[in-house]
Amino acid sequence: MGAPALLWPPLLLPLLTVLFGHLPGTLAQAQVCSANQTVFTMNENTTVSGPLADIFVPEDQYVTLGQLSTPNAFKVEGNKLFLIVTPDYEENSLLEAVLECKRGDTLVTQFRVFVAVLDINDNAPEFPFTIKEYNVSEDTRVNTIVIPETELKATDADKDDILVYTLQEVTPNASKFFSLVGINSPALKLDQTLDYYKSPNMTFRLLARDTREENVIPSHTATATVVLNVLPADLRTPWFLPCSFTDDYFCIQAQYHTVIPTGHKLPSPLILSPGPIYAVDGDQAINQPIVYSIMMGNTDDTFIINKDDGNLTMAKSIPSPMTFTLVVRAEQADMARYSVTQAVVEARDVTGNPLQFSQSLYFGTVVLGSEAGTAVKDKTFPSEILRIQAQYLGFPDLNSAVTYQVTNSSEFIMNKDILLTTVPMETERTIRIEVEANNTVTKDIATTIVEIQVSEREPPSTESPTPPEAGGTTGPSSNTTLETPSTSGTSQGPATTSSGGSAGPFPPAGTTLSPLTSAPTVPGGSPTLGISTSPQTATPGGDATQTPKPGTSQPMVPTPGASTSSQPATPSGSSTQTPKPGTSQPMVPTPGASTSSQPATPSGSSTQTPRPGTSQPMVPTPGASTSSQPATPSGSTQTPKPGTSQPTTTGPISGVGELGDGQRFSTVDMAVLGGVLGALLLLALIFLIILIHKHYRHRFTCCSGKAKEPQPSGYDNLTFLPDNKAKWSPTSNRKPEPGPEPVQPPLRPPSPMSSSPTPPSSMPPSPQPKASGSPKTVQAGDSPSAVRSILTKERRPEGEGGYKAVWFGKDIGAEADVVVLNEPTADVDSASASGSEGSDDDDDPDQKKSLRLGAVADNTYV
């Protein structure tokens, strides 16, 4: 019993534990409701498809969902609890289900089940705007916050998200002007000075991201557009135009200049260069009105400036030449800014500067059928209106006071410098009118001539006419000789006309004038009109027919059956002068044409051919007999001067300027071609000179230079006989002995550059090898003309030893001059051995002795 009694305490403790620990619970479980789990945790946006929890309900009880539960979040089906919504942290971070167990209507047990919702990044940031515009002044200082953070900040519903901002430019180069203060602070600041005229507005795209890195998942971004409008500020002073811009804020102001006449008060505003006084507000967007004034330089208040438009006018005349330097001020109307510049006005004497037209002869055209009021077109450029202007050279202000009128025709009227028709143009014709220019200030008058062609269509432009000397005088003009064409044949007779002023010639009725490329004037200022006729016509009376002057272009197009001649031959024996260099006479032969460039002259006279550079191709048509020099019964024919282009049209004249397209070359084209050819010719000449100098230099050196003097064998007195100079002296008293007088060939070639020729008979013999100091005499067998030597006793000055040797030729008279030449002394022994017959009894022993002394002697040949 003792042993069993000892076993009870250990067994009693587990028994009590079971009885007191489990039995109450088991009894309670059998009496109240319960759930297997009452607290749940899940991420938002998680969907639970099965039951959330299992509920234990006693047999005599039932469970319901209490009213304090989260609405529409749970439901109870049987003994199971379901979550019927997708949890959202931003809407409800904690869901609660209140479960009630009842027995009948009596509440027995109540307990709660909680669902904790965890936040995740499931929401994108949001800006309070989509597009927003802001105005920024142009003069805003750098580093200024132009848009605060509160106006650009985005929001994110996620609790722990930190937004990152990025500014992207939409307008190119806009990012260099603005930037964000920081990646987490969207405040916008100015980084560079604004320029309204370069960037009047800029657009940016603002991004907000809820993750620091872009590639993180999940990541959300919001976008908004920011537009910045730059408002102009008053930063620039007024600018005088035209001005050279250095940047967008400053410019080099224009300075004005003009010339006015003395003694006259000009009624209209002065014409200045480079333009009128005009200033604008440098801030064009603000564009404040400008007020003008003269600050200084207006001596005696001579000038007045309009404060609104800047026009400068004269208040009084200026008696004598002087210069005004006006300082002109341009100020904004709000008086905020101003600028100054100079206007230099020179007063000069107008004497010596007459009113004159730019051309003494104008060519115009009007389409047939034109109504009244039609402007006359320029014949050279039919698409442009013909403008007739007279002016004073160097006085632009006087030109504004010039009025124009037509003096000899009621069919045209001047509208300023434009010529208008007053009646319809119904017939084809050529009309010549006189236009008069009158200066209302100086009362000067100038006239010019306008030749107007009325045709069915505007004639094609051939070559631009070269304007003649600016003409137009007020005095009466002299008679003008005009070469008019004849419709039958090629003879050309002069027609003499006259008109008042320098009006120029008027052609007879029915004459068709060619559209010449130039209208040269004859001496005196009257223009000579070029007419499409033959330039060289036959003159049976023997008179010379003068052809057009240089620069006249006369196309030469023979028609069928016509005989065209550009250079008539003279059967009476006179020579025909052909064109000079530079004359162009193009004539292209066609089938059936008989062309002769140089026909024979019946009387046997020589016909001068064209000089170098003359081009004389001929253009006859089928059946035409063409010769460049046809026969002329008598007299001489003067041909064109250099530079004259004379293709000629013969036969019936049906139109004007009927040249082929290939002949439409302007004066500028010819000048360019001439310049190129001249440059090529110059290069060819330079190359030729270099070649000649390289290959023939030694010949020019030996032929053009003086003969080299042989070195003397002894002492030479340079006082008596200077080098390189010929000394002339009379012959000695002794006459040469008679003898044969054949021509003595020169023993040595004379220098071609020698200024003093030596007689052939007195040429010295070639020097022989030196033996002694005696000169060599000419042998009798060597030359038919005997030459002998006489040694004179005449001594040289002290200190200069030696004698003078005089050589006499027998064929030289006493009246001949003596040429003194420096020659080296010949060998004495050779001279004595030669037995020259030039020596005679006058040679005394002293002279022979002096020869043997080896002294240097002067050889004088007579």
UniProtKB/Swiss-Prot annotation:
Q: Where is the signal peptide?
A: 1-28
Q: Which UniProt keywords apply?
A: Calcium, Cell membrane, Cell projection, Differentiation, Glycoprotein, Membrane, Phosphoprotein, Repeat, Signal, Transmembrane, Transmembrane helix
**What residue spans carry the Pro residues bias annotation?**
739-768
Give the residue ranges for region: 4 X 31 AA approximate tandem repeats. Answer: 545-648
Which of the residues are on side Extracellular? 29-671
Summary of the tissues where the protein is detected: Expressed predominantly in kidney. Also detected in lung and small intestine.
Protein name as it appears in the record:
Cadherin-related family member 5
Record membrane topology = Single-pass type I membrane protein
Residue numbers spanned by region Disordered? 452-658, 706-803, 821-862
Chain positions with Phosphothreonine modification? T758, T825
Biased composition annotated in UniProt, kind: Basic and acidic residues: 791-801
Main subcellular location: membrane
Residue ranges of sequence repeats:
545-575, 576-606, 607-636, 637-648
- Supply the SUPFAM superfamilies for this chain: Cadherin-like
Q: Which PANTHER family match?
A: CADHERIN-23 (PTHR24027), CADHERIN-RELATED FAMILY MEMBER 5 ISOFORM X1 (PTHR24027:SF414)
> Ranges of Polar residues compositional bias?
529-652
Question: What molecular function does GO assign, one term?
Answer: beta-catenin binding
Its Gene Ontology cellular component terms are: apical plasma membrane; brush border; brush border membrane; clathrin-coated pit; membrane; microvillus; microvillus membrane; plasma membrane
Query: What lineage, starting at the top, does this entry show?
Result: Eukaryota, Metazoa, Chordata, Craniata, Vertebrata
From which source organism is this entry?
Answer: Rattus norvegicus
Q: Where is this region: Mediates interaction with USH1C and MYO7B and is required for proper localization to microvilli tips and function in microvilli organization?
A: 693-862
PTM note says: N- and O-glycosylated.
